[in-house]
A protein has these predicted regions:
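Bacterial signal peptide processing site
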Residues: 22-25
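Early exported N-terminus immediately downstream of N-terminal targeting peptides
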Residues: 28-95
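Second-shell loop/turn segments in exported
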Residues: 75-83, 143-148, 162-164
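Surface-exposed, polar helix/loop patches in the mature regions of secreted/periplasmic/lumenal proteins
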Residues: 93-149
Length: 185
Protein backbone atom coordinates (compact mmCIF):
# COMPACT_ATOMS: atom_id res chain seq x y z
CA UNK A 1 0.00 0.00 0.00
CA UNK A 2 2.85 2.42 0.78
CA UNK A 3 4.32 1.81 -2.66
CA UNK A 4 1.13 3.08 -4.30
CA UNK A 5 1.57 6.52 -2.69
CA UNK A 6 5.26 6.72 -3.59
CA UNK A 7 4.68 6.32 -7.35
CA UNK A 8 2.98 9.74 -7.77
CA UNK A 9 5.72 11.32 -5.67
CA UNK A 10 8.47 9.81 -7.83
CA UNK A 11 6.61 10.77 -10.99
CA UNK A 12 6.26 14.37 -9.76
CA UNK A 13 9.95 14.58 -8.85
CA UNK A 14 10.99 13.25 -12.25
CA UNK A 15 8.70 15.74 -14.01
CA UNK A 16 10.14 18.61 -11.96
CA UNK A 17 13.65 17.48 -12.81
CA UNK A 18 12.93 17.52 -16.54
CA UNK A 19 11.12 20.86 -16.35
CA UNK A 20 13.93 22.48 -14.39
CA UNK A 21 16.52 21.58 -17.04
CA UNK A 22 17.18 24.46 -19.40
CA UNK A 23 16.94 23.18 -22.95
CA UNK A 24 17.88 26.55 -24.47
CA UNK A 25 21.18 26.48 -26.33
CA UNK A 26 23.98 28.35 -24.61
CA UNK A 27 27.66 28.97 -25.18
CA UNK A 28 28.43 26.49 -22.39
CA UNK A 29 26.32 23.70 -23.94
CA UNK A 30 27.82 24.49 -27.35
CA UNK A 31 31.29 24.12 -25.87
CA UNK A 32 30.46 20.81 -24.19
CA UNK A 33 28.73 19.44 -27.30
CA UNK A 34 31.63 20.33 -29.63
CA UNK A 35 34.77 19.78 -27.55
CA UNK A 36 35.34 16.34 -29.07
CA UNK A 37 33.63 16.89 -32.43
CA UNK A 38 35.50 16.46 -35.70
CA UNK A 39 37.35 19.58 -36.79
CA UNK A 40 37.30 21.08 -33.28
CA UNK A 41 39.91 21.43 -30.56
CA UNK A 42 39.13 22.36 -26.95
CA UNK A 43 41.17 23.28 -23.91
CA UNK A 44 40.16 24.10 -20.34
CA UNK A 45 42.54 25.30 -17.70
CA UNK A 46 42.42 27.15 -14.38
CA UNK A 47 44.20 30.47 -13.99
CA UNK A 48 46.79 28.73 -11.77
CA UNK A 49 47.90 26.92 -14.93
CA UNK A 50 49.58 30.16 -16.03
CA UNK A 51 51.98 29.81 -13.08
CA UNK A 52 52.43 33.55 -12.51
CA UNK A 53 54.82 34.57 -9.74
CA UNK A 54 52.78 36.87 -7.48
CA UNK A 55 55.97 38.62 -6.30
CA UNK A 56 56.63 39.88 -9.84
CA UNK A 57 53.26 41.57 -10.45
CA UNK A 58 51.44 44.67 -9.27
CA UNK A 59 48.59 44.65 -6.77
CA UNK A 60 46.14 45.49 -9.56
CA UNK A 61 47.40 42.56 -11.68
CA UNK A 62 47.16 40.26 -8.67
CA UNK A 63 43.56 41.36 -8.06
CA UNK A 64 42.73 40.72 -11.72
CA UNK A 65 44.30 37.25 -11.64
CA UNK A 66 42.47 36.37 -8.42
CA UNK A 67 39.14 37.30 -10.04
CA UNK A 68 39.68 34.81 -12.90
CA UNK A 69 38.66 31.20 -12.27
CA UNK A 70 39.36 29.44 -15.57
CA UNK A 71 39.73 29.65 -19.33
CA UNK A 72 37.83 27.69 -21.99
CA UNK A 73 39.11 27.64 -25.55
CA UNK A 74 37.25 26.02 -28.44
CA UNK A 75 38.44 26.22 -32.03
CA UNK A 76 37.29 25.00 -35.43
CA UNK A 77 40.05 24.67 -38.02
CA UNK A 78 39.40 24.76 -41.75
CA UNK A 79 42.38 22.47 -42.34
CA UNK A 80 40.57 19.77 -40.32
CA UNK A 81 37.02 20.65 -41.36
CA UNK A 82 34.99 22.06 -44.22
CA UNK A 83 34.00 25.55 -45.31
CA UNK A 84 30.29 24.69 -45.12
CA UNK A 85 30.55 23.44 -41.53
CA UNK A 86 32.74 26.44 -40.62
CA UNK A 87 30.12 28.92 -41.84
CA UNK A 88 27.23 27.07 -40.16
CA UNK A 89 29.04 26.70 -36.81
CA UNK A 90 30.29 30.29 -36.83
CA UNK A 91 26.78 31.58 -37.53
CA UNK A 92 25.43 29.45 -34.68
CA UNK A 93 28.00 30.87 -32.25
CA UNK A 94 27.21 34.41 -33.42
CA UNK A 95 23.52 33.75 -32.72
CA UNK A 96 24.37 32.52 -29.22
CA UNK A 97 26.32 35.72 -28.59
CA UNK A 98 23.28 37.81 -29.54
CA UNK A 99 21.69 36.65 -26.28
CA UNK A 100 20.80 39.62 -24.07
CA UNK A 101 23.38 38.79 -21.39
CA UNK A 102 26.30 39.27 -23.81
CA UNK A 103 27.40 42.88 -24.29
CA UNK A 104 29.62 43.50 -27.31
CA UNK A 105 32.59 45.47 -26.07
CA UNK A 106 34.36 46.03 -29.38
CA UNK A 107 35.24 44.52 -32.73
CA UNK A 108 38.30 44.68 -34.96
CA UNK A 109 39.35 43.37 -38.34
CA UNK A 110 37.94 42.76 -41.77
CA UNK A 111 36.66 39.91 -43.91
CA UNK A 112 40.05 39.39 -45.61
CA UNK A 113 42.35 39.14 -42.58
CA UNK A 114 39.86 38.04 -39.96
CA UNK A 115 37.75 39.50 -37.20
CA UNK A 116 37.88 39.72 -33.42
CA UNK A 117 34.85 40.48 -31.27
CA UNK A 118 34.96 40.78 -27.50
CA UNK A 119 31.86 40.34 -25.36
CA UNK A 120 31.31 40.66 -21.62
CA UNK A 121 28.71 39.39 -19.18
CA UNK A 122 28.06 41.85 -16.38
CA UNK A 123 29.16 45.42 -15.76
CA UNK A 124 32.68 46.66 -16.54
CA UNK A 125 33.70 46.46 -12.87
CA UNK A 126 31.72 43.32 -12.01
CA UNK A 127 32.00 40.80 -14.88
CA UNK A 128 31.52 37.06 -14.68
CA UNK A 129 32.62 36.25 -18.22
CA UNK A 130 34.64 37.67 -21.10
CA UNK A 131 34.19 36.02 -24.51
CA UNK A 132 36.60 36.53 -27.38
CA UNK A 133 35.41 35.37 -30.81
CA UNK A 134 38.10 35.20 -33.48
CA UNK A 135 37.35 34.17 -37.04
CA UNK A 136 39.12 34.01 -40.38
CA UNK A 137 37.78 32.63 -43.65
CA UNK A 138 41.24 31.12 -44.28
CA UNK A 139 41.83 29.57 -40.83
CA UNK A 140 38.58 28.92 -38.94
CA UNK A 141 37.23 30.34 -35.70
CA UNK A 142 37.95 30.21 -32.00
CA UNK A 143 35.91 31.07 -28.92
CA UNK A 144 37.93 31.91 -25.82
CA UNK A 145 36.01 32.29 -22.58
CA UNK A 146 37.50 33.85 -19.47
CA UNK A 147 35.31 32.85 -16.54
CA UNK A 148 35.51 34.44 -13.13
CA UNK A 149 33.78 36.38 -10.41
CA UNK A 150 33.64 40.15 -10.09
CA UNK A 151 36.27 40.66 -12.79
CA UNK A 152 37.16 44.29 -13.50
CA UNK A 153 37.55 45.12 -17.19
CA UNK A 154 40.33 47.68 -16.78
CA UNK A 155 42.31 45.33 -14.52
CA UNK A 156 41.84 42.39 -16.89
CA UNK A 157 43.02 44.50 -19.85
CA UNK A 158 46.25 45.26 -17.95
CA UNK A 159 47.10 41.54 -17.99
CA UNK A 160 47.79 41.53 -21.74
CA UNK A 161 51.50 42.42 -21.52
CA UNK A 162 51.95 40.06 -18.56
CA UNK A 163 50.45 37.11 -20.45
CA UNK A 164 52.55 37.90 -23.54
CA UNK A 165 55.71 37.45 -21.42
CA UNK A 166 54.70 33.98 -20.18
CA UNK A 167 56.33 30.91 -21.69
CA UNK A 168 53.24 28.95 -22.63
CA UNK A 169 54.95 26.51 -25.03
CA UNK A 170 55.59 23.93 -22.34
CA UNK A 171 51.98 24.03 -21.22
CA UNK A 172 50.61 22.54 -24.48
CA UNK A 173 48.67 25.70 -25.28
CA UNK A 174 50.75 25.86 -28.44
CA UNK A 175 48.89 22.74 -29.64
CA UNK A 176 45.69 24.82 -29.73
CA UNK A 177 47.33 27.59 -31.75
CA UNK A 178 49.13 25.13 -34.06
CA UNK A 179 45.78 23.46 -34.73
CA UNK A 180 44.37 26.86 -35.68
CA UNK A 181 47.23 27.82 -38.04
CA UNK A 182 46.36 27.99 -41.73
CA UNK A 183 47.54 25.12 -43.86
CA UNK A 184 50.27 25.99 -46.32
CA UNK A 185 49.88 24.98 -49.91
Amino acid sequence: MKLFFLKPLYFTLICLLFLSCNSEPSLQTYYVDHQEASGFIAMDFPVSFLDIDINDITESEQKAINSIQKFNMLGYSLKSGSDIVYKAELNFVKQLLKEVKYNELFRLGNSKDGRIKIYTVGEDHNMDEVVILLNSNQVGFAVIRVLGKDMNLSEIMQLGPLIEKLDLDYKNIDSFFNFMKPSTL
